[in-house]
Amino acid sequence: MAKLWFKFQRCFRYFRRKPVRFFTLLAIYLTAGSLVFLHSGFVGQPAVPQSQASPAAGSPVEGAELPFLGDLHLGRGFRDTVEASSIARRYGPTFKGKDTSERAKLGDYGGAWSRALKGRVVREKEKEKEEEKAKYIGCYLDDTQSRALRGVSFFDYKKMTVFRCQDNCAERGYLYAGLEFGAECYCGHKIQAANVSESDCDMECKGERGSVCGGINRLSVYRLQLAQESARRYGSAVFRGCFRRPNNLSLALPVSAAMPNMSVDKCVDLCTEKEFPLAALAGTACHCGFPTTRFPLHDREDEQLCAQKCSAEEFESCGTPSYFIVYQTQVQDNRCMDRRFLPAKSKKLIALASFPGAGNTWARHLIELATGFYTGSYYFDGSLYNKGFKGERDHWRSGRTICIKTHESGQKEIEAFDAAILLIRNPYKALMAEFNRKYGGHIGFAAHAHWKGKEWPEFVRNYAPWWATHTLDWLKFGKTVLVVHFEDLKQDLFTQLGRMVSLLGVAVREDRLLCVESQKDGNFKRSGLRKLEYDPYTAEMRRTIAAYIRMVDTALRSRNLTGVPDAYGPR
């Protein structure tokens, strides 16, 4: 140690006497390091031929009766490991990544320019598909005293786009969307103003260069093509159906008012003002209230029985004294909104198990409303925590949550739970939902480039076998398993959610379940305006998935359970 210190002192004194040599050597050292760093930047990852790829992709075995399922037991990092593990890596300079003929196809500008050009073309095609969902009508006069579109409105002086306005109006069930001042969006069921010259609509959208968003007191108006569920709305109110008058009207619907000039919006506005979630139109009378056991809204009647025209709006139906037209207002039913952690640590761990894309997040929302307790998760998703799932941050074994979300399969993971609700969904729908989540978020959409590119076929090849093994594993290794089909939950939420609450050991309260029915969508439903315009499944994909469906159906029936719904397709 003393010798080393002595040598260091000699070097220090030497360079102190000759500083020029010191800085020269330092500059040479830094230059050499920079060259090594720059050289490492030329390392690429060329595509590996199919013959060299990992065989763990789970491709069907030729000549076999059923497709090969493989050992697809994924851990907590399942979202990232599937793709990473299936590709072998090779490193080398980029000029060896492609042969001469392949590089020639890229032109003089190389791959980066081609990718940028391709991305622009894809974005233009996506925009064209979005525009097909709405037809431009024209430029219309607008006045603050007498609006052309008299529904809801919202403003965004930084990020307003045509599609954003259309999407918001479509979600609320309006037929028309109009943009003004480059940043204002108005919705309505009819245009109540005159058409003017197109040159008057000359203001660019604040969030989209090159797009027109009206002008000064001028609206750029679009006619929307609504999804089926959106078409059953009236502005911000949701159409619930035609129902027979309840036996004890004053108890079922406690607030009533006579309206000689009845219209849907007048009754909805009255009940909204009185803070009731239901508006029932009965000819010239408007009734307001909550869904209760006296008026549960479960037995719908033929809409022709409610087809009496409104006195103030000839194109609207206002029901009769015996048959009510019912709308749900935007007033929140607070009877099922309180949530908390379990007061004492639970002795049982109950899983809410599903394949990704099968509606687990939605089911958690329903369970929290129905029980009043937070649900937990085997994972952690910050975006879900920010949306109100406060149990997301708890460890899954904490015992403070009513059940635990999990996508796990495999004996060890399953046997860690004392019981499970197994949520099963049509694989065709589940795969598409998970693909949208993966590339677009919980309520977003994957871009058309992802559907048309290599991502979708690879996704189906990896995830379709897992849809089957996930269900089979839970049926085999689960201690107590309640099977709930996503489609049944949507169609008969009251009954199916009651079954789920019973398994969780919580008393079933009918009024609370009725409250959940009116809040069932939450903030976890994708927009109705933007839909995929074609079937992404090839004939080969459908044959493979059909075999998995038959396998799961057989397993369910062998345990005296209901088989998969008929909507899954031929078996």
UniProtKB/Swiss-Prot annotation:
Protein localization: Golgi apparatus membrane
The entry's keywords: Glycoprotein, Golgi apparatus, Membrane, Repeat, Signal-anchor, Transmembrane, Transmembrane helix
Stored InterPro entries: P-loop_NTPase, Sialate-O-sulfotransferase, WSC_carb-bd
Membrane topology according to the record: Single-pass type II membrane protein
SMART domains with a match to the protein in the record: WSC
Domain of life where this protein originates: Eukaryota
GO cellular component, one term: Golgi membrane
Function field: Sialate:O-sulfotransferase that catalyzes 8-O-sulfation at the Sia-glycan level using 3'-phosphoadenosine 5'-phosphosulfate (PAPS) as a donor, forming 8-O-sulfated Sia (Sia8S)-glycans. Displays selectivity toward glycoproteins such as TF/transferrin.
Stated name of the protein: Sialate:O-sulfotransferase 2
Organism: Mus musculus (Mouse)
